[in-house]
Amino acid sequence: MSDPLPAWSDAFELGRLPPVPQLVLDGPINREWAIGGSTGAGIKVAIIDSGIDASHPAVGSVEGAIIIEPDDSEPDGFRVIEGPHTDLYGHGTACAGIIRSVAPDVSIYSVRVLGERLTGKAWVFATGLEWAIENGMNVVNLSLSTSNEAHIPMFHELTDAAAFAHVMLVSAMANEPKTTVPSEFSSVFSTASIRSDDPYEVRYNAAGPAEWAARGVDVDVAWADGSSITATGNSFAAPHVAGVIALLLAKHPGLTTFQVKTILAAMATAPGSVTQ
C-alpha cells in the first residue's frame, strides 16, 4: 500500500479539478477586447452600504434588498429584513447610480448595513458580506471599511471565501492615509480615486496598497430624495471599477478573481477604445 498523500493533494487529481475558463486571444488584451459591446446583462452586483433609493431615476430597478441591523432580542444579535427600503444617507444611492451608468443592464442588490450617520458595526457589515457571497453575487461594491485590527481575521476569512467563490470584491480605500480592511487584502480590488472624465478608465498600481484607481473626483452622483450632488472620494471610484468588472464578467463569464485582475492590469496599460 502506498503512503497517503499530503493534505490537499487529492483536490488536484485529474478529473477533480473544477474547470477554469481558458482565454482565447485573437489580439491584445485591451478595453475593446475586454468590455466592448458589454452592458453587464446577467451579472449580479451587490452594494453593501446605506441602502438604495430605487425610485431615483439614475438608479433604475433594484432586484433585491435586505437590511441587516443590530437587535439584541435575536439569538444572533441582529435581524435581517427583506424587501424594499430607503437610503438613510444617500451614499448607497450614489454608488448604485454610478454602477448603473457604467453597466446599465446589471442586476443591482442593496444590502443596508449603515445607519443615517453612515456608521455601523463591523460584524453587521461582515454579515452583509457573507449574505452577498452566499447568495450568488458576482460583484460586491464595498465603499466602506474598518480600521479596527480586531476585525482583520473575520474579514480575511470572508474575503478568502469570496475569492474561491469567484465573487469580485471592490473596496474603496480610506480617504485618509490609514490601514483599513477588507480593502487592503490582496484578493480585493482596492480602489482609490483620480480626476478623470472617462468612466471606464482604470489605472493599475502594482506597488499597492491601493492597487486600482478610477474616476472619483468632482463626480456628479445620485443622492437621497431624488437629488444629486458633486462628490469626491474613493467611495465613488470603487463603483466605477465594480461597473467595469461587471462588463468584463458579462462578456467573459466564469473568470476567477486573479484572471480579472490580470485583464484589468492589461487594460490599464493598453486602454484602447470601447464600443458601448
Predicted regions and their residues:
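Active-site core segment of subtilase-fold serine proteases
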Residues: 2-102, 106
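Mature extracellular/periplasmic domains of secretome proteins
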Residues: 33-40, 120-141, 151-167, 177-190, ...
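Active-site/binding-pocket entry motifs
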Residues: 53, 68, 73, 114, ...
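Subtilisin-like peptidase catalytic core
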Residues: 78-147, 266-268
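Gly/Ser-rich catalytic serine loop of serine hydrolases
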Residues: 84-93, 174, 229-241
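Structural detector of well-ordered beta-strand residues that form the stable sheet scaffold
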Residues: 109, 168-170
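C-terminal subdomain of the subtilisin-like protease fold in secreted/lumenal serine endopeptidases
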Residues: 138-142, 252-276
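Extracellular S/T/G-rich loop segment that most often corresponds to the catalytic His/Ser-adjacent loop
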Residues: 180-250, 254
